Amino acid sequence: MNTILLIGGTGFLGSHLLNVLLKNHEDIYVVEHKKKIKDVKELRVIRGGIKALNSGMINKIRPDVIYHCARPTVPKLRKAGRKIAAYKAEKLNSRLLNELKKSKVQPSLVFVSGSLMYGNSKEAHNEHSGLNPISFARQYFKGERPLVSACFRNDYPVQILRFPWILGDGSWFKWFYMEAMKKYRAIPSFGDMKNTMQFIDVHDAAELMRLYATKAPAPGIYNVFSDQSLRQEDFVKMLSKIFRLPVKNYEEIFTKQLEKEVQEAFASNIVLNTSYPDILDKYTFKSLHESLDSLK
């Protein structure tokens, strides 16, 4: 049994990861911030958020792995809020790394990132591709910078897992598709719809976080994705068939003007590739149709 420390266990991906860890009977410590951790007797809760973690606590807990799924948010301020959140994240992640480096244990740190960090390209991105953050990632990158730097300097065992569009009942799909379908009875489209989108089910993403923590050959950056990629036009057609609703340009649906970052993200052409295909050789992914059908 491994000892696990989970940061961000109430979020979209973090809550699914917590279920995976519980299913595998890990010894789990969970950091609680504003939102309450679910009441499960197997969990040990650390209150006070990421600021509560220090080298002394790490030495006491002696985790084998720390999973980091948290990101500060100030949603009411939109772009300005993301800039504030990125500044906070940079400070918090720098402090966390410093405390981990001071500890006697120095557990591996597994951090969640996304494919928007690579930016638009007709070519697939592998782990050695340069970063060109677009959309929301322009602000998020500042918060991730201490962890990316640690990877490149190789001065602490950090894994950064970059996922494509994570599909589930929450996050982007809930905000921009499910809520639009319920409220406006239509499916939004963005741009000319010729861009390729790549998907992974949230349950698979959570399972694979645990897999990479144990099977990845070394610290570093890993692109984690399934082979499920579609042009946006085919994605919205699939949604239209499953939910039996028409496809309309987003400007016909949303009464308030969406931020340009939203439009840029959904019209972006980003496909992941990997230099480490062996890690996923025996993994069976949930199909895109199955994922969408489960959200009806």
Outline where the language-model segments fall:
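C-terminal amphipathic/interface module of NAD(P)-dependent oxidoreductases
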Residues: P246-N249, V262-K296
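Active-site Tyr-X1-5-Lys
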Residues: N132-Q159
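NAD(P)-dependent short-chain dehydrogenase/reductase
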Residues: S149-T196
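Mid/C-terminal beta-alpha module of Rossmann-like enzyme folds, strongest
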Residues: A206-V262
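NAD(P)H-binding glycine-rich loop region in Rossmannoid oxidoreductase-like domains
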Residues: L43-R95, E99
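Substrate-positioning beta->alpha
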Residues: Q139, S171-M178, F190-A213, G220
